[in-house]
Each structure stands twice: as structure tokens, then as C-alpha cells.
Amino acid sequence: AGMAFSNALLGITHSLAHKTGAVFHIPHGCANAIYLPYVIDFNKKACAPRYADIARSLKLPGNTDDELVDSLTNMIKDMNKSMDIPLTLKDYGVDEKEFKDSEDFIAHNAVLDACTGSNPRSINDAEMKKLLEYIYYGKKVDF
């Protein structure tokens, strides 16, 4: 598995999981599951056709790339629900004050994480912080 990860590269889903796992003690797999739909929405500006191809191969509904990407992220959220994986950091139980106190540190260090360089869309500290906030509150990524 490690060889596959090394060859595939991982992107900001893992960058976030590394840093929030360390701060909030979220198991890595659970963190990745929570973050994946948000990261797909963030990345779709850079690679929506690729995500749409995945959705098509899964026979998900949609005519446009945006509709197909939405179907893909909805499917992931439904899978998470079926396994009792929370959809947000707030639902996971991360205290809001603790989150606010840590988000700058997490965002900055997630940008510096080794996995960030392989993400299909570049991201800076401010965008990473905003993405974290969307993940905490469950807001649809719109930037």
C-alpha cells in the first residue's frame, strides 16, 4: 500500500488529515473520509473533467461536469453516513473554540505538508483556512 501511495501522490486531503489528526486526534482514515468531498469541490476548478469521468464510470447521475462532480461528492457523503462517519469537523466533536484557536496553525502547516505539492490545484494559507472553515461548518465549497 505504501508503494502505491508513493506513486499516486495524495494531495491536500491527506495534508489536512495529517495536521488535524495531530491537533484534534482524529483517526487518519476518518479524517480523509470527512475531507474528501470538500477537497474534490475545491479541486474541481482544476480537474472537473477527471472527476466527472469517475462519476460516469460509477454510473452516477448528471449531464454536465458540475452535476457529475456533485453526484460524486454526494455519493461519498452518503457512503460516510452509511458508516457513521461525520460529515463535518463540528459533527465529529471538535470544539469550536479549539478549532478557531488552531485553524491558522493547521492551515499553514497543511500548506507546507509534503502531500500538498501533488494537489491538482494550488492552495495558499488563506484558502486552506477557508477550506478548513467550510469543512468545520459543512459549507459547500464555492471558491
Label each PLM-derived region with a short phrase:
Residues Y51, P61-F143:
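C-terminal charged capping/lid subdomain of soluble metabolic enzymes
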Residues A1-D78:
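Active-site segments that bind and position negatively charged phosphate/pyrophosphate groups
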